[in-house]
UniProtKB/Swiss-Prot annotation:
GO terms for biological process: rRNA 5'-end processing. One of its GO terms (cellular component) is cytosol. Its main location: cytoplasm. It comes from Amoebophilus asiaticus (strain 5a2). This is Putative pre-16S rRNA nuclease. It is an enzyme of class 3 (hydrolase). The keyword Nucleotide-binding does not apply.
């Protein structure tokens, strides 16, 4: 069984999280610059068995032509071309940034660390992945 990686795609930064090999626990991985994402993923997939990607997608937005929706759609196409052996899922990312910010407060992070957008991005990816795992297991297993 391979890992599942979640991607919280942003125009500037991309938060990444990954499961353990048994696909039980979602953990924050890192945050990379948006233009470095493909290179990072190619390197990571070469050393780790990644079975699937879960891309956070704002599912309840009426205007599908916003810059972020267009960028996420293009990124998904890029993933499909570069990783034909991995499944690619879209998963609702609504409110993940707010949940991540609240988790940092509850976790006792200092104000400086809570303002660090890299922490928010990788934690948002982890929330997306945990939500996907819960939903996936409920519907497909």
């Amino acid at each position: 069984m391979g890992r599942i990686m979640a991607i919280d795609y942003g125009l500037k930064r991309v938060g990444l999280s990954v499961t353990d090999p048994l696909q039980i626990i979602a953990s924050p991985l890192t945050t990379v610059a948006a233009n470095d994402t493909l290179t990072f993923l190619q390197t990571y997939v070469k050393k780790e068995n990644v079975e699937a990607f879960v891309v956070g997608y704002p599912t309840d937005i009426k205007d599908k032509n916003t810059p972020i929706i267009v960028a996420i759609s293009q990124f998904i196409e890029l993933l499909q071309r570069n990783f034909p052996d991995q499944q690619i899922f879209q998963h609702d990312e609504r409110y993940t940034s707010k949940l991540a910010a609240a988790s940092l407060v509850e976790g006792g992070f200092k104000k400086k660390d809570r303002r660090n957008k890299e922490n928010l991005d990788k934690l948002s990816a982890t929330i997306i992945l945990q939500s996907f795992l819960s939903s996936y297991k409920r519907h497909y297993i």
